[in-house]
C-alpha cells in the first residue's frame, strides 16, 4: 500500500501509468483508491475509462462484477458501507460522483439470468426493466455531499428486495449484460402479497 499526498491528481495519474505496469498493488491518493489489478491490460482499461472525455464505454461482465457485485464480509447495514465501497470499487463518472448506486450480494450468473425474465415498469415509469424472481440483499447509495472525487459522501440503505435492471447486448460475448441497476424493490410486509403480470404487488382481499 502506498500513500501519496503531495502531487496533483493529473500528475499522480501520469506517474501511476508509468509505475503500475511494473508493480501491481494498491495505491491511495488522499481518499481516492486505486485497486490492485492482475495485469497491465486491466489497469490500462481503468485509466482509459477514468480519463476519457468521450462516450462511456459499453458495459462488460467484468465491469458489472467490479462495480456492482459484492462478497460477504462488511455488514450490509454498516452506515459507512457506500463510502467505503464506492471508493474501493472506483464507482465514479469521469471525475464526478455518481448520484446513486446499488451494490448487490449475489453471483453474476444469477444476475445475468434476470435479463431473460419478463418486463416490468422501471422506477421512473418509462422504460422497461427486467425483475429478478428471487429476493436479493443489497445496499442503495444516495449522494449527500460533494460532486467531484474524492469528496463524495453517501448515505447507505440496506435493502432486501427484487432487482430491477436494464440489459445491454454485448456483441463480443453474444449475451445480454445486466447493467445498469434501476432499483431494488422491497416487497410489502404483508406475507400474502404477490406480483401481478404488470409487476405490481397485490394483496388479496
Swiss-Prot record:
Compartments where found: Secreted
Disulfide bridge map: 97-152, 115-167, 122-129
A Pfam family this chain is assigned to: RnaseA
Glycosylation sites: 130, 142
Keyword Cell inner membrane: no
GO molecular function: nucleic acid binding
Signal sequence segment: 1-24
UniProtKB keywords: Disulfide bond, Glycoprotein, Secreted, Signal
InterPro entries: RNaseA, RNaseA-like_dom_sf, RNaseA_domain
Main location: secreted
GO terms under cellular component: extracellular region
Source species, domain of life: Eukaryota
A single BP term in Gene Ontology: defense response to Gram-positive bacterium
Family affiliation: Belongs to the pancreatic ribonuclease family.
Function recorded in the entry: Does not exhibit any ribonuclease activity.
UniProt-recorded name of the protein: Inactive ribonuclease-like protein 9
Protein source organism: Cebus albifrons (White-fronted capuchin)
Amino acid at each position: 500500500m502506498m500513500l501519496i499526498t503531495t502531487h496533483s491528481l493529473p500528475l499522480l495519474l501520469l506517474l501511476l501509468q508509468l509505475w503500475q505496469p511494473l508493480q501491481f498493488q494498491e495505491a491511495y491518493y488522499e481518499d481516492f483508491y486505486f485497486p490492485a489489478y492482475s495485469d497491465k491490460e486491466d489497469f490500462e482499461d481503468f485509466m482509459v475509462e477514468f480519463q476519457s472525455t468521450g462516450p462511456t464505454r459499453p458495459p462488460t461482465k467484468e465491469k458489472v462484477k467490479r462495480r456492482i457485485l459484492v462478497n460477504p464480509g462488511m455488514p450490509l447495514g454498516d452506515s459507512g458501507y457506500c463510502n467505503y465501497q464506492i471508493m474501493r470499487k472506483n464507482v465514479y463518472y469521469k471525475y464526478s460522483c455518481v448520484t446513486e448506486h446499488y451494490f448487490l450480494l449475489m453471483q453474476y450468473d444469477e444476475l445475468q439470468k434476470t435479463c431473460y425474465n419478463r418486463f416490468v415498469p422501471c422506477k421512473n415509469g418509462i422504460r422497461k426493466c427486467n425483475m429478478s424472481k428471487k429476493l436479493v440483499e443489497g445496499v442503495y447509495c444516495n449522494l449527500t455531499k460533494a460532486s467531484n472525487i474524492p469528496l463524495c459522501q453517501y448515505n447507505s440503505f440496506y435493502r432486501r428486495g427484487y432487482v430491477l435492471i436494464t440489459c445491454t447486448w454485448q456483441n463480443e460475448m453474444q449475451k445480454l449484460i445486466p447493467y445498469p441497476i434501476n432499483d431494488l424493490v422491497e416487497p410489502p410486509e404483508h406475507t400474502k402479497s404477490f406480483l401481478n403480470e404488470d409487476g405490481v404487488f397485490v394483496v388479496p382481499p
